[in-house]
């Protein structure tokens, strides 16, 4: 693993830590102002760091956490296997899944694209990251 790989992973660790403590401004500090975010489940893509931040902010959840389980680097992309937990604000229904996110970095170590994948989309996440099992 080279220095750039370590720097990308460190940036993602800091972003996850910020997200988990509810500091969404700090969580998007690694994002390019024109970052493209592709939410899970076929939702429409969103553009811009503010749109990414707005998506992170809980609306239907009273609690939410995303813990990275491992990182796989391929060029300028990092595939993160993660454990996501959330609890519905009104319903109390709990979400507890393992899913994937592919983060694409530019030369300045800013994230230009974030692609989120549901539990059953592992092969799509691997393909998006340029990895094959």
What spans do the regions from the language model cover?
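Short, well-ordered beta-strand segments in beta-rich or mixed alpha/beta enzyme
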Residues: 78-86
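Hydrophobic/aromatic beta-strand elements that line small-molecule binding cavities or substrate pockets
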Residues: 66-72, 84-85, 98-104, 115
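Short, low-complexity N-terminal intrinsically disordered segments enriched in polar/charged residues
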Residues: 1-30, 123-133
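A solvent-exposed, acidic/Ser-Thr-rich amphipathic alpha-helical stretch
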Residues: 7-10, 24-77, 123
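A short, structured loop/turn motif at beta-sheet edges
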Residues: 71-78, 104-110
